Amino acid sequence: MDEFHRYGKEDNSRQQCFLYPLFFQEDLYAISHDHYLDGSSSSEPTEHLSSNDQFSFLTVKRLIGQIRQQNHSIVLFVNCAPNPLADCKKSSYSESVLEGLTLVLEVPFSIRSKYSVEGMNEWKSFRSIHSIFPFLEDKFPHSNYISDARIPYSIHPEILVRTFRRLIRDAPSLHPLRSVLYEYRNSPENLQRSIIVVPRVNTRFFLFLWNYYVYECESILFSLLKRSSHSRSLSHRPFPQRTHFHRKIKHIIIFSRRNSLKSIWLLKDPKINYVRYGERSIIAIKGTHLLLKKCRYYLLLFRQCYFHLWSEPYRVCSHQLSKNCSSSPGYFLRVRMNPLFVRTKMLDELFIADLITNEFDPIVPIVPILGLLAREKFCDVSGRPISKLSWTNLTDDDILNRFDQIWRNLFHYYSGSFGRDGLYRIKYILSLSCAKTLACKHKSTIRVVRKELGPELFQKSFSKEREFDSLPFSSKAAARSQRERIWHSDIPQINPLVNSWQKIQDLKIENLFDQ
């Protein structure tokens, strides 16, 4: 692999001509077999394969031949196997073939990413959920329109193969990819004409497909931002100091006020900001409504022409931030106009100036969270707490820890929003549901449970001190935390309740357009 990378660096065209012979290199499948054994979440392959069984590369080559012949008797996906215990050894070979296919397809993309790192990076994408909140705090108050777009994840397999052909000209290396995609499309779990490309499938092959697909979708926005820049030069590379560049131009043409204003206006780029998390992306625009319509039209039209699929209009929702709210990622997002009165006194005269500032205002979706708690059997549809019957077979500590974890996740995730009073209603529902669950387990009442177990158990799980354990222990700090917004850094992944709520919102929008 390193030798192939070295040849690709010397001659970039060679990366598109020598991919297919890599499928028959035994070292490649040894690496993929080790990746499969190390990254497998299930221990069934290692349990049912004895130590005397050796990995045969001849069997792997025969499987490759069966893939090329479109022989659907083999199962390339473990989840589609009718009897995974009987076909365990076959599944290990199939996963090794998929790993080998992924390793081969990753070669040209790794070379291209290496070149982009060595040169000047023109496209910087956020790679962590912790980058979303500073982006919202910094960019949203200076934007007046927002476009909430969902990446289309249902795509025909032939379109994916054609997108790979734009980079890889080695046609034989794409035949196994085409066969695998068509077999997955014809599998019993996916009986439709298109395949679903989502990041939730925890296999290297589908993660690679998703990353490549998202890269192609985001390249559309990159070209839009590149074309909208009026001050591009130096081979379309960005200026390291754009602020000083504008100041120099303004200083040079200051003698002509009319021309200078026009020139400076042309040099100012339209503020188009982009952020993505998972399958949803947000485009914040500072400009007119016509610019928003053009951006939305460009996005839909380019997706239709580039991927040869019909982009559903409801997947790109555009509205004004000061009047409407957006529901991503798990918040109701809006920009609130905050009037600020400033009084200045000069000598004996008093001047009053009214300033209006924009403030980012994320809102906690209390009603959707109550609906999700009702679905999870923590309360009824009216918000009245009920016992969690499925947890009555657990120990008291496990029950308290589970309720405590749910409340802590909710509070930490929504700690950066204004109006957190509704969260304490959620806290009351969870605490009372916890008490009813313990009472149902011990076949007694809530009063008896409190008397026997003691109130310190509930204070341990639902005390206010745990909410501010990262702050200085003072009353002023606790009072200030009620007014200020704190984005906690211990949310490496989005709350499962937020994901469920987002799915419900998507289904409501899709059903509205289907009627």
UniProtKB/Swiss-Prot annotation:
Keyword field contains RNA-binding: yes
Keywords, ordered alphabetically: Chloroplast, mRNA processing, Plastid, RNA-binding, tRNA processing
Record's keyword annotation contains Chloroplast: yes
Single biological process term from Gene Ontology: RNA splicing
Organism domain of life: Eukaryota
Pfam families per UniProt: Intron_maturas2 (PF01348), MatK_N (PF01824)
GO CC, alphabetical: chloroplast
Cell compartment(s), UniProt: Plastid, Chloroplast
A single MF term (Gene Ontology): RNA binding
Principal subcellular localisation of the protein: plastid
Protein family (similarity comment): Belongs to the intron maturase 2 family. MatK subfamily.
Function: Usually encoded in the trnK tRNA gene intron. Probably assists in splicing its own and other chloroplast group II introns.
HAMAP family: MatK (MF_01390)
Protein name as annotated: Maturase K
Organism: Pinus armandii
Gene: matK
